[in-house]
Swiss-Prot record:
Keywords: 3Fe-4S, 4Fe-4S, Disulfide bond, Electron transport, Iron, Iron-sulfur, Metal-binding, Transport
Highest taxon of source: Archaea
Stated name of the protein: Ferredoxin
Disulfide cross-links: 20-43
Provenance organism: Thermococcus litoralis
The UniProt record lists the keyword Cell membrane: no
Keyword Metal-binding listed: yes
Function: Ferredoxins are iron-sulfur proteins that transfer electrons in a wide variety of metabolic reactions.
């Protein structure tokens, strides 16, 4: 699955990094970033579904 984060939509709540720390972390600007471009981890989907702004895409 391909993972991406829309930095403009991200509000920096950190839910994704809490749910799936192997895939997401918060950058120096307080925004989420994907640590990997692709993953098979189901938590990436859960993080995308939990994102309050829909900033995470998992395809």
């Amino acid at each position: 699955m391909k993972v991406s984060v829309d930095k403009d939509a991200c509000i920096g709540c950190g839910v994704c990094a809490s749910i799936c720390p192997d895939v997401f972390e918060m950058d120096d600007d307080g925004k989420a970033k994907a640590l990997v471009a692709e993953t098979d981890l189901e938590c990436a989907k859960e993080a995308a579904e939990s994102c309050p702004t829909g900033a995470i895409t998992v395809e």
